[in-house]
């Protein structure tokens, strides 16, 4: 199969990677203004993947071949808050979690999706949890930012990585136990480890 681009005609063998800034993908709906991507998530055995831009746009792609980004087609964009720098989904795809990256703001927003991994219908915000009230300490004079959120397979455990620009330990991963799977409002802090 050949691909016609502004740079000429190429065979699929010439495509070594997946470039979301490539004109062929921009033509599918990706904004040309987006310059940096901060998080990625694959779902449904690699047939769907999401990319989060630095400005908080969550872009969804469908893949006709699992984990082969060369087979991707653009589906839609869901605009999150511009401070969001990380996201995750529940295993069944009915919950979306968005982590605020603003300095000294440790908020995790939970959204409900109308159907698994469906961001074409605006997700409904369920709640926002201030992680500094349930175990992540903010130290005066230090610029801490939450950088990633992940869950174990069944959603009974949550992990938040935090970057601290001025402390002795620059990275710390916090572990939380969830009283109800994938319900961040039931989180209790277990501990943390410095990296």
PLM features: what roles do these ranges have?
Residues 4-16, 62-70, 110-121, 176-186:
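Short loop/turn segments immediately following beta-strands, especially the blade-tip
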Residues 7-32, 73-80, 124-141, 188-195:
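Surface-exposed loop and turn segments in beta-propeller and other repeat-based domains
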Residues 32-42:
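Beta-strand-rich domains and repeat architectures in extracellular enzymes and scaffolds
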Residues 36, 83, 145:
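Beta-rich catalytic cores
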Residues 44-45, 91-92, 153-154:
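Residue-level detector of Asp-centered blade-edge/turn motifs that repeat once per structural unit
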Residues 55-57, 102-106, 164-169:
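Short glycine/acidic-enriched loop and turn motifs that connect beta-strands
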């Amino acid at each position: 199969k050949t691909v016609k681009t502004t740079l000429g005609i190429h065979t699929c063998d010439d495509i070594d990677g997946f470039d979301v800034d490539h004109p062929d993908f921009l033509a599918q709906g990706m904004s040309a203004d987006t310059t940096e991507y901060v998080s990625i998530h694959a779902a449904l055995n690699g047939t769907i993947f999401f990319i989060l831009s630095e400005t908080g746009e969550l872009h969804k792609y469908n893949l006709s071949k699992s984990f082969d980004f060369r087979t991707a087609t653009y589906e839609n964009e869901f605009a999150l808050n511009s401070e969001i720098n990380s996201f995750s989904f529940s295993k069944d795809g009915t919950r979306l979690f968005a982590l605020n990256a603003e300095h000294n703001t440790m908020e995790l927003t939970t959204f409900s999706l109308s159907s698994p991994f469906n961001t074409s219908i605006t997700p409904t915000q369920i709640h926002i949890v201030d992680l500094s009230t349930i175990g992540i300490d903010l130290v005066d004079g230090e610029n801490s930012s939450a950088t990633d959120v992940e869950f174990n397979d069944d959603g009974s455990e949550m992990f938040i990585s935090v970057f601290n620009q001025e402390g002795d330990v620059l990275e710390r991963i916090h572990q939380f136990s969830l009283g109800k799977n994938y319900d961040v409002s039931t989180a209790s802090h277990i501990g943390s480890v410095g990296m």
